C-alpha cells in the first residue's frame, strides 16, 4: 500500500508562504481559489503514491506534441558472425559514436510507473508500433485516439561503410515508415517547418532538411488559423499559426514523434574495406530507446504510464499528464495520520475527489527514475522511516520557531505593560486607571517545550529502528560469513559424541565375532576334529 500524503491548507496568509517542500500545497490552493471553491482554505488535501491506486491521465494537446521534448538513448551489440575483426570494428564504433553528440549512450531503466490509469478525454494523436518480437508496453483502444500513426517497425535498416567513408555521418538508409488513415494528410504544404533547430547537432541522421511539399497539414488536428504539420522526412510535427510570422517558437531538439518512431527500429552498421574483406561484413547494431525530457509529461500506453519507451517497443501510446488519486475534505474532519507502520489511511466518507488538478502540479515529475520493484522492501521501509523521522524533526523545529516568536511577543507585551504601569503610577497602575480587573498571561512554553522534546525523542527512536532494522541484518550476514564454514565440523563433532559409544560397541562386537570365526577355522584346518565315540552294545 502506498503512503498517503495529507496536507492541511491553512488560512490564506499562511498558505501564501512559499515553501520549497510543499509545491503541491501552493498549486492546489491557487487552483481552488481561482475556481471559487469553498475548500480553498482550512481543508485536507490527500493523495496516494501507490502504483496500484487508480490515477487520472490527461492527453496532451496537438500543440504540446510539437513542443514537448524527448531524448534518445543508444546502446549497441556486436554481430554474432563477427570474428577476428574486433580491433578495426572498435575503431569504427568510436568514429560512429562521435556522430551522436546529442544522444545519451547509457540506457535508462524501463518499466511502468503507474499501472492503473484512467484516460480522461480523447487523445489527439496516438502512435501504434507493431513488431513480432518487440516489448509490449500497453495498448490504448482506438476509440480514445483521434488520429493514429502506425509505424512499420518490422524493417531492419543498415548503414554501409567503406574505408574512405569511416568518418561520414550515419543515417537511416530508409527512415521508419509511418502510415496514416485515409484522408488524414491534406495536400496543403507549408514552408514553416523548413530548417533545423539551432540547439541540435546537424550531424545526427534524422536531422536532414525537409524537402518542399513534404510538410503536409493534418486535417483532423488543424483549423483555419492554426495548422498542425507533419514533416514526413524527419517524422516531426509542427504547429503554425497562420495569423503570425514564421518565427513563432523554437522546435525541440528531438520531438516526441521522431523519438517514438526511431525507437521502433534499429540501425545496423556494416563495412567493406581491406580490414573486413571485399564482401559486406555486419559489425554491430544500434538499439535506440526514447524518453520524455519535458518535466511532468509521460507516455500513456493502455492503463500504464512510462517515462521511457524501450527499443523495439510495441503497442499504442500517446503522451499526456498524470495525477494520482486526489480528494479533499473539510478541515474540521478528523483524519488519522499514521506515524509509523503500514496501515492504510481510510478514505473519508465526505471526501470530494479533486479532479481539476492538471498538468501544472508536476506531482509525478520526479518519479521517472523510479521504478517499482528495484529496491528491497526492508530497505524501502527503513528509508521511509528515516524520512518520517526527518519530517518530525522539521515539524519540531517549526514548533520551536513558533514558540520562540510567541515568547518574544509575550516579552514585548509585558514590557509595554510595565511601561504603562510606570506612566500611570500616580493613579495606582494601569488596572486602577482603567477600573478593570488586572489580568496576567500564563506562559505555557514549558509544556510546548516538553511536547517538542517528545517529538524529537520519537524521531530519534524511529531513526534508530530504521537503522537497526537494516544494519542488524547486515551485521548478521557478516557473522554468517565466517561462522558458516565452522558449522560442518561442529555438527560432525556433535554427531560423533552422540553416536560414538554405540558405534564403538558395534565395532568391538564385530571384531570379536570375526576373531572367534577365524580361530575356529584354524582349528578345523589343523585336523583337530572331535572324536566320534560309539556306544558299546554291552
UniProtKB/Swiss-Prot annotation:
Residues 500-538 are cytoplasmic. Keywords: Cell membrane, Cleavage on pair of basic residues, Disulfide bond, ERV, Glycoprotein, Membrane, Signal, Transmembrane, Transmembrane helix, Transposable element, Viral envelope protein, Virion. GO terms for biological process: myoblast fusion; syncytium formation; syncytium formation by plasma membrane fusion. One of its GO terms (cellular component) is plasma membrane. Residues 16-478 are extracellular. InterPro entries: TLV/ENV_coat_polyprotein. The chain crosses the membrane at residues 479-499. CDD domains: HTLV-1-like_HR1-HR2. A motif (CXXC) lies at residues 43-46. Glycans are attached at residues 133, 146, 177, 220, 241, 247, 312, 332, 443. The keyword Glycoprotein applies. It holds the Pfam family TLV_coat. Gene3D superfamilies: 1.10.287.210. The surface and transmembrane proteins form a heterodimer. They are attached by non-covalent interactions or by a labile interchain disulfide bond. Interacts with MFSD2A. HERV-FRD subgenomic RNA has been observed. Ortholog in old-world and new-world monkeys, but not in prosimians. Contains the CKS-17 immunosuppressive domain present in many retroviral envelope proteins. As a synthetic peptide, it inhibits immune function in vitro and in vivo. This is Syncytin-2.
Amino acid at each position: 500500500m502506498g503512503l498517503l500524503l495529507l496536507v492541511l491548507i491553512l488560512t490564506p496568509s499562511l498558505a501564501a508562504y512559499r515553501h520549497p517542500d510543499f509545491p503541491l500545497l501552493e498549486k492546489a490552493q491557487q487552483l481552488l481559489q481561482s475556481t471559487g471553491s469553498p475548500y480553498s482554505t482550512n481543508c485536507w488535501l490527500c493523495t496516494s503514491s501507490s502504483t496500484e491506486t487508480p490515477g487520472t491521465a490527461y492527453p496532451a494537446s496537438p500543440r504540446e506534441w510539437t513542443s514537448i521534448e524527448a531524448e534518445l538513448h543508444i546502446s549497441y551489440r556486436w554481430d554474432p558472425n563477427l570474428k577476428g575483426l574486433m580491433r578495426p570494428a572498435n575503431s569504427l564504433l568510436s568514429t560512429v559514436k562521435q556522430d551522436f553528440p546529442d544522444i545519451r549512450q547509457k540506457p535508462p531503466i524501463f518499466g511502468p510507473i503507474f499501472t492503473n490509469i484512467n484516460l480522461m478525454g480523447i487523445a489527439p494523436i496516438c502512435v501504434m508500433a507493431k513488431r513480432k518480437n518487440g516489448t509490449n508496453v500497453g495498448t490504448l483502444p482506438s476509440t480514445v485516439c483521434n488520429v493514429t500513426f502506425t509505424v512499420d517497425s518490422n524493417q531492419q535498416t543498415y548503414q554501409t561503410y567503406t574505408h574512405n567513408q569511416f568518418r561520414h555521418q550515419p543515417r537511416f538508409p530508409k527512415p521508419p515508415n509511418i502510415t496514416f488513415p485515409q484522408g488524414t494528410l491534406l495536400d496543403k504544404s507549408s514552408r514553416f517547418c523548413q530548417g533545423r533547430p539551432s540547439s541540435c547537432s546537424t550531424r545526427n541522421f534524422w536531422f536532414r532538411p525537409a524537402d518542399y511539399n513534404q510538410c503536409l497539414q493534418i486535417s483532423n488536428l488543424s483549423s483555419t488559423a492554426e495548422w498542425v504539420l507533419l514533416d514526413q522526412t524527419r517524422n516531426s510535427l509542427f504547429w503554425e499559426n497562420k495569423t503570425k510570422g514564421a518565427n513563432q517558437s523554437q522546435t525541440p531538439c528531438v520531438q516526441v514523434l521522431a523519438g517514438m518512431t526511431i525507437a521502433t527500429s534499429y540501425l545496423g552498421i556494416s563495412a567493406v574495406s581491406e580490414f573486413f574483406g571485399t564482401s559486406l561484413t555486419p559489425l554491430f547494431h544500434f538499439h535506440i530507446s526514447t524518453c520524455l525530457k519535458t518535466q511532468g509529461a509521460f507516455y500513456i500506453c493502455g492503463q500504464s504510464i512510462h517515462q521511457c519507451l524501450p527499443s523495439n517497443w510495441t503497442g499504442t501510446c500517446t503522451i499526456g499528464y498524470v495525477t494520482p488519486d486526489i480528494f479533499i475534505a473539510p478541515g474540521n474532519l478528523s483524519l488519522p495520520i499514521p506515524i509509523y507502520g503500514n496501515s492504510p489511511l481510510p478514505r473519508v466518507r465526505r471526501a470530494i475527489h479533486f479532479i481539476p488538478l492538471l498538468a501544472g502540479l508536476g506531482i509525478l515529475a520526479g518519479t521517472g527514475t523510479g521504478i517499482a520493484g528495484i529496491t528491497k522492501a526492508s530497505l524501502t521501509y527503513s528509508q521511509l522511516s528515516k524520512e518520517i523521522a526527518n519530517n518530525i524533526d522539521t515539524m519540531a523545529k517549526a514548533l520551536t520557531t513558533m514558540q520562540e516568536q510567541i515568547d518574544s511577543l509575550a516579552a514585548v507585551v509585558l514590557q509595554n505593560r510595565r511601561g504603562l504601569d510606570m506612566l500611570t503610577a500616580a493613579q495606582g497602575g494601569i488596572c486602577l486607571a482603567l477600573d478593570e480587573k488586572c489580568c496576567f498571561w500564563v506562559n505555557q512554553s514549558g509544556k510546548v517545550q516538553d511536547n517538542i522534546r517528545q517529538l524529537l525523542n520519537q524521531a530519534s527512536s524511529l531513526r534508530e529502528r530504521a537503522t537497526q532494522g537494516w544494519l542488524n541484518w547486515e551485521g548478521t550476514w557478516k557473522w554468517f560469513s565466517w561462522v558458516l564454514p565452522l558449522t560442518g565440523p561442529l555438527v560432525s563433532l556433535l554427531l560423533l559424541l552422540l553416536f560414538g559409544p554405540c558405534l564403538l560397541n558395534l565395532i568391538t562386537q564385530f571384531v570379536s565375532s570375526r576373531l572367534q570365526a577365524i580361530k575356529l577355522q584354524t582349528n578345523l584346518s589343523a585336523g583337530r576334529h572331535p572324536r566320534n565315540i560309539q556306544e558299546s552294545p554291552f
